[in-house]
Each structure stands twice: as structure tokens, then as C-alpha cells.
UniProtKB/Swiss-Prot annotation:
Post-translational modification: Polysumoylated. Varying sumoylation depending on tissue- and cell-type. Highly sumoylated in bladder and NIH 3T3 cells. Sumoylation is required for nuclear localization and enhances PAP stability. Desumoylated by SENP1. Inhibits polymerase activity.
Stretches for region Disordered: 1-22, 523-565, 577-704
Family classification: Belongs to the poly(A) polymerase family.
Organism: Homo sapiens
Domain of life: Eukaryota
Sequence ranges of Low complexity compositional bias: 1-17, 523-534, 583-594, 611-640, 694-704
InterPro entries on file: NT_sf, NuclTrfase_I-like_C, PolA_pol_cen_dom, PolA_pol_NTPase, PolA_pol_RNA-bd_dom, PolyA_polymerase
GO CC annotations on file: cytoplasm; nucleoplasm; nucleus
Subunit record text: Monomer. Found in a complex with CPSF1, FIP1L1 and PAPOLA. Interacts with AHCYL1 and FIP1L1; the interaction with AHCYL1 seems to increase interaction with FIP1L1. Interacts with NUDT21; the interaction is diminished by acetylation. Interacts with KPNB1; the interaction promotes PAP nuclear import and is inhibited by acetylation of PAP.
Localization per record: Cytoplasm; Nucleus
Protein name: Poly(A) polymerase alpha
Upper taxonomic lineage: Eukaryota, Metazoa, Chordata, Craniata, Vertebrata
Glycyl lysine isopeptide (Lys-Gly) (interchain with G-Cter in SUMO) crosslink, residue number(s): K444, K445, K506, K507, K736, K740
Gene3D superfamilies: 1.10.1410.10, Beta Polymerase, domain 2, Poly(A) polymerase predicted RNA binding domain
Length: 745
């Protein structure tokens, strides 16, 4: 079985004597014969998904990295000569390429890119890296698609070297020469470095620390391969959208390995779900005790930094300066992940009892059958190059929209699918490149209320304004770059998405919306990084049955997915039930295991909860509320609690039918919001008749438009948001989205 990266030193075969982690292990039990059999079955199940790379491809990567390393050494010698360094220094000046990320961890998949770091001595400037080294790469015949992103948060050179995509960061150390045996984990290397170099070094330092903090690297790698595949298949692998990225999943698996140091992969996968389905967030996950290096770098510490108290699911990197790798997680994304952990525990319980096979764990749930209501975001650009830039910007802001939606008092959950899809063209005769994302919505059951309106117009419009402004400020914006949103019922999704994505071959009514058909073959789900999610599929052509992690099946009454300006959609609220997964049924007596929480910070009283008023007039925000998030359960042990995040306030932005939509709206404290009430399923148990009224704000007449014509017709000038830089004198046209849902009892 291939393990694609050489390990750091030999791994001990005897049960480890060293203590790993910040708590004692839960169990030191050695693997049984049945565990070995299950592990082999796990390996066989993983193979069709392409998670293992062939030895030939591995050697090709090693050869390419060797060539790149030689180029770096040659380039640094040339720079040294041009700066008139002594010959004795030039001969030993060194320079080296380090790797990090999935390749360094040894868990990269077939065709995955390589994250690399170029380390240079003190006399080599960053400007040299982006000029002379860039020019040197350009001369290499194996190098294609060379591009520099010098102004990025972490500056990078991207290239394709002999068919392998590589991202190269740069760090200049305060050393005269770079020795071959340099250990980047040495904190003293960070002294006198600029912040860009520290950021560039962070990836390597974190990856190397993780590998040094696990008892057995091979067991860690196989377990991480399985968990990463599971996360991708279940649409919860995306740091940028508020789920977890590769390094976060690696740290969760590493913590599991520390708690069960002698266990092998089959056991570790099960224990992973056991530990994190019971974890008392927001207690942080730590692989080692944080160390202070007195370098005055900002580190994650909720005792010192009030903003750190808002983090809902902290997973702390082990290398200084310690950071929370999951600061993007929201109430909704955490709830989705916790429910998936519980479902994973239930499935692995069955596997250990020989009631199910490993393939069941990797069955993909059908996101498009899970919810009754969806928001579809569409981004379009006139060229493919512009589309790539535009899509990257829009995707990086979607989590802000999700955070805004979940603060609506009538929205229980806003679940974004990390996959993006090609969208039908607005004008078949016009060259246009379009991408869409889908957000599933769950509405709370309304009590003793009638005709409550859920107005999402402000949230959508402020989101589009934010995206446009950043595009303008970064000089990325082009005239034909557009973004729009629409409310879509589940029954209408087939007109936006191809059948093989929906996984449901059922005849649907086409009444209400007509969209250009999508070409199934145009779907591209091959992107694989922390921020762009891919969904590996087994090489066999067998179709997996959708695994609905929450067992939901919603109603199918169908409105038009696009609504006219100032239109109102009437829906009935459905009761939200909480699916409970009985994690105490885990095999091997695991139900009685106490999961040690890793928080060591003393409890701190959070600052007073804000009561913020805001005035909404179309899209103008006055006195914007601070970013906040929903409350989460903390550990019962007061000595190990961290400050509870400030409870997210719910917007009462949905006036009664008779109220004016422009009426002043206030935010109220939601002191009793319980994350456990955010259910993913059970909507159909109280499913009632739904009716759709589409009425304009002036004529009250029913109007149905096609999605394409809607996007062309709803364009107005965007107004200003007080917390965002103003638009230029001639504001660009922004698609106005009026999405109002009326909840009827």
C-alpha cells in the first residue's frame, strides 16, 4: 500500500512510551485481529476513490521537487554573486524548497497540487523572488501557466511544473546561509522577520509539528485519508465557506491519535466520530500546550483577545504563533458538522458490529433533497479568466451571507453546499461564463403568529454590495461581472442542475420557470484545496444511494424559483424536529469513555451582549451591528472552560404583513438560543399545504418570469453601506434581489 511521502525519522513499532497531547490517553489498548481485518477492508474501500497515488507518480513528484530545489540553489548563488558576497559564503549559501500541506502530511490524492516554500538567506529580497526567480522559472520548458500573486495576503508564485501544479511561497530568514538540515520548527527563526515571511513559514511549521505530535505516522495518515474523503463526500470540506479545511481535519485526526496512541486506522476512524460527536464546543482542540516565545506576535487567546471569544469551534495550530484554523465556522456550519459527526458515529458503530460495510460511510448524502427552500447565488463574467477571479471573490464572501441569514429570527439553518456548478446562460447568443452556489434554508416553526414575513432582501443586497465594492477597490471589477440571487423550491432545482447531481430521476412540472438546459458533462468538480471542495467518486460506475444524514424528506410544492422585484412568496412554516443520534451505542464500551476537553484557559465573563438598532432603507445600513455568533455549549468543568462566545442576536427583520417593509427594525438579544435545536431534518413530519403568492409591491398582480429574464430585469443602482467604502461617483448597476417569504400558520 503506497504512503506517498517519506516519514520524518523511523517510526517505533512497539507501543509508544512517550506521552502525546495535553491530557492522558483514553485507551492504550493494542489492536485486535478484527481491527486489522477492518483496517484492510478500509484500505480496499478507499482505493477506488483515488486517495492513493501510484509509486510511479510519487517518484515523479519527488523528481520535480528535486529539480525545483536545484533551481532555487542556483538562483540564490546568482543573487549572491550579483550582490558581491565573498566566494566562501557563495559556495555554502544554500537555499531550500520545503513542502507543507497534504503532500508533506503524506495524504495527497492523485493529481493534487503541491504546496511549497522557498527559504532563502537574509541577503535575498522578496522582490528578487518575484522578479529574477520568476524570470528563471519562465525559462524552464517544463513550466507552464506561470503567474505571480505578489499582493496576496500570503504572496505566492503559481505554476504547473511538468504537469504538477505547485504553489511556491517565499520566506527570507535572518541567516547568512541556509543549512540542509534546517528545522523550521525552531521558534528562534522567527526573530526579526517581517509578517509576510512569518505567514509563509506558518504552513511548514504547523505541518511539521503535527507529524511530531502523533504516536504513529502511518496510522495517522491512513485515518486522515479516510476522514478527508468522508468530509468531501459529505460536503463539509471547505475552510473558505465556514467548514473545515485540510489542516483542521488533520489536527482533529491527530488529537484522536493522541487519545488512542496504539489504535490502528479502523479503530481511529470510529474513535474520531466518538470524540467529536461528544466534544463540548467551544472548548478548543489543542495538540500541545501553547508556548510563549516573547516575540510579540498575536496568538489565539480568548483571555486577551475579545474577538477570540466569538469563535465557535476553535482548533488551534500547534506552532507559534498559535492561531485558530476555524475562525470562519458559523452557527450553521458547526451544526451541520456536529450532525455529520453523530451520523458518522452511528455508521461506524454498525461497521464494527459487522452490520454495515465501510462503503456506507462514504456514501454521499443528497443535499438537494434535504431542504425545502434554497437560495441560489449566480456569478457571471464575460471571459473565463475574469470568471475565475470573480468566482474566487464571490466564494470568499458567501460565508458572510450565511452568517447574515442565520441571524434572521425565522431561519434555523443556512447550509451552503461547498460545490459550485455551471449555471445556464442569461443570453444563449452572448459569450458568458456563469457559476452558481446553492444554500439550503430551514425555517423555524412559528408559534401563535400568522402572516409573518421573512424578508431576505436586505441580506442579499448588502452581500452583493459588499462583493462589488471589494471588486472595485481591488481593481478587479469589469462591467459585465454580475452577481444575483433567487429563492428556489426543491422541486425547481431540476431546472438549474443536471440529473446526475440531483440523483433523483423523477418527472417534474416545468410550470413557473424555464431555464436553458445544462450539459451534464460541463460539471467540473476537480478542484481540490482547503478552499475549493472536490467530491471524489469511486472509479466504478456504480451509483451510490444518497445518504441523508438527517433522514429528511421535504415537501414538493413548487413556486417559481425567481421572483420579481418586491415580490412576496407565501410559504407555511414547518416544524423543526431534532434528530437524535444515540452515540452511547458505540462498540467496545466506548459509550462510557470520558472525552477530555483540551481547554485550559480560566473562565472569563464575556463583555455585555450588544443591543443594536439599525435602520434599513432599501440597502442602506446605519449603525451596523458587530459580528456575532450563536451560543454554544461549554464544558461542565468550570476549570476548563473558555469564555462562552457572545450569543448571536437574531434580527427581527420580518414584519407582519400589514407592516411597512421599510419600517425601522431592531436586533434583540437571543439569550436562550440552543444550538441543539438547529435540526437538519424532520421538516416533512409536520409538512402542511404550501401556497405561493407572487405579488408586486404596486399592483399585487401575480407574475412569473424565467430566471434568465429576471436577472436581466432587476438591475438598479446600489446604495451605500456605512461600514464599507463608498462606490465611485458613477455606481455600477447591481442586480436588486427582493426575496420575501411569508410564513403562514
Amino acid at each position: 500500500m503506497p504512503f506517498p511521502v517519506t516519514t520524518q525519522g523511523s517510526q517505533q513499532t512497539q507501543p509508544p512510551q512517550k506521552h502525546y497531547g495535553i491530557t492522558s490517553p483514553i485507551s492504550l489498548a493494542a489492536p485486535k485481529e478484527t481491527d486489522c481485518v477492518l483496517t484492510q477492508k478500509l484500505i480496499e474501500t478507499l482505493k477506488p476513490f483515488g486517495v492513493f497515488e501510484e509509486e510511479e507518480e510519487l517518484q515523479r513528484r519527488i523528481l520535480i521537487l528535486g529539480k525545483l530545489n536545484n533551481l532555487v540553489k542556483e538562483w540564490i548563488r546568482e543573487i549572491s554573486e550579483s550582490k558581491n558576497l565573498p566566494q566562501s559564503v557563495i559556495e555554502n549559501v544554500g537555499g531550500k524548497i520545503f513542502t507543507f500541506g497534504s503532500y508533506r502530511l503524506g495524504v495527497h490524492t492523485k493529481g493534487a497540487d503541491i504546496d511549497a516554500l522557498c527559504v532563502a538567506p537574509r541577503h535575498v529580497d522578496r522582490s528578487d523572488f518575484f522578479t529574477s526567480f520568476y524570470d528563471k522559472l519562465k525559462l524552464q520548458e517544463e513550466v507552464k501557466d506561470l503567474r505571480a500573486v505578489e499582493e496576496a495576503f500570503v504572496p505566492v508564485i503559481k505554476l504547473c511544473f511538468d504537469g504538477i501544479e505547485i504553489d511556491i511561497l517565499f520566506a527570507r530568514l535572518a541567516l547568512q546561509t541556509i543549512p540542509e538540515d534546517l528545522d523550521l520548527r525552531d521558534d528562534s527563526l522567527l526573530k526579526n522577520l517581517d509578517i509576510r515571511c512569518i505567514r509563509s513559514l506558518n504552513g511548514c511549521r504547523v505541518t511539521d509539528e503535527i507529524l511530531h505530535l502523533v504516536p504513529n505516522i502511518d496510522n495517522f495518515r491512513l485515518t486522515l485519508r479516510a476522514i478527508k474523503l468522508w468530509a468531501k463526500r459529505h460536503n463539509i470540506y471547505s475552510n473558505i465557506l465556514g467548514f473545515l479545511g485540510g489542516v483542521s481535519w488533520a489536527m482533529l485526526v491527530a488529537r484522536t491519535c493522541q487519545l488512542y496512541p496504539n489504535a490502528i486506522a479502523s479503530t481511529l476512524v470510529h474513535k474520531f466520530f466518538l470524540v467529536f460527536s461528544k466534544w463540548e464546543w467551544p472548548n478548543p482542540v489543542l495538540l500541545k500546550q501553547p508556548e510563549e516565545c516573547n516575540l510579540n506576535l498575536p496568538v489565539w487567546d480568548p483571555r486577551v483577545n475579545p474577538s477570540d471569544r466569538y469563535h465557535l469551534m476553535p482548533i488551534i495550530t500547534p506552532a507559534y504563533p498559535q492561531q485558530n484554523s476555524t475562525y470562519n465556522v458559523s452557527v450553521s456550519t458547526r451544526m451541520v458538522m456536529v450532525e455529520e459527526f453523530k451520523q458518522g458515529l452511528a455508521i461506524t458503530d454498525e461497521i464494527l458490529l459487522s452490520k454495515a460495510e465501510w462503503s456506507k460511510l462514504f456514501e454521499a448524502p443528497n443535499f438537494f433533497q434535504k431542504y425545502k427552500h434554497y437560495i441560489v447565488l449566480l456569478a457571471s463574467a464575460p471571459t473565463e479568466k475574469q470568471r475565475l477571479e470573480w468566482v474566487g471573490l464571490v466564494e470568499s464572501k458567501i460565508r458572510i451571507l450565511v452568517g447574515s441569514l442565520e441571524k434572521n429570527e425565522f431561519i434555523t439553518l443556512a447550509h451552503v453546499n461547498p460545490q459550485s456548478f455551471p449555471a445556464p446562460k442569461e443570453n444563449p447568443d452572448k459569450e458568458e461564463f456563469r457559476t452558481m452556489w446553492v444554500i439550503g434554508l430551514v425555517f423555524k416553526k412559528t408559534e401563535n403568529s400568522e402572516n409573518l414575513s421573512v424578508d431576505l432582501t436586505y441580506d442579499i443586497q448588502s452581500f452583493t454590495d459588499t462583493v462589488y465594492r471589494q471588486a472595485i477597490n481591488s481593481k478587479m471589477f469589469e462591467v459585465d461581472m454580475k452577481i444575483a440571487a433567487m429563492h428556489v423550491k426543491r422541486k425547481q432545482l431540476h431546472q438549474l442542475l443536471p440529473n446526475h447531481v440531483l440523483q433523483k430521476k423523477k418527472k417534474h412540472s416545468t410550470e413557473g420557470v424555464k431555464l436553458t438546459a445544462l450539459n451534464d458533462s460541463s460539471l467540473d468538480l476537480s478542484m481540490d484545496s482547503d478552499n475549493s471542495m472536490s467530491v471524489p467518486s469511486p472509479t466504478s460506475a456504480t451509483k451510490t444511494s444518497p445518504l441523508n444524514s438527517s433522514g429528511s424528506s421535504q415537501g414538493r410544492n413548487s413556486p417559481a424559483p425567481a421572483v420579481t422585484a418586491a415580490s412576496v412568496t407565501n410559504i407555511q412554516a414547518t416544524e423543526v424536529s431534532v434528530p437524535q443520534v444515540n452515540s452511547s451505542e458505540s462498540s467496545g464500551g466506548t459509550s462510557s469513555e470520558s472525552i477530555p476537553q483540551t481547554a485550559t484557559q480560566p473562565a472569563i465573563s464575556p463583555p455585555p451582549k450588544p443591543t443594536v438598532s439599525r435602520v434599513v432603507s432599501s440597502t442602506r445600513l446605519v449603525n451596523p451591528p458587530p459580528r456575532s455568533s450563536g451560543n454554544a455549549a461549554t464544558s461542565g468543568n468550570a476549570a476548563t472552560k473558555i469564555p462562552t462566545p457572545i450569543v448571536g442576536v437574531k434580527r427581527t427583520s420580518s414584519p407582519h404583513k400589514e407592516e411597512s417593509p421599510k419600517k425601522t427594525k431592531t436586533e434583540e438579544d437571543e439569550t436562550s438560543e440552543d444550538a441543539n435545536c438547529l435540526a437538519l431534518s424532520g421538516h416533512d413530519k409536520t409538512e402542511a399545504k404550501e401556497q405561493l403568492d407572487t405579488e408586486t409591491s404596486t399592483t399585487q398582480s401575480e407574475t412569473i418570469q424565467t430566471a434568465a429574464s429576471l436577472l436581466a430585469s432587476q438591475k438598479t443602482s446600489s446604495t451605500d453601506l456605512s461600514d464599507i467604502p463608498a462606490l465611485p461617483a458613477n455606481p455600477i448597476p447591481v442586480i436588486k434581489n427582493s426575496i420575501k417569504l411569508r410564513l403562514n400558520r
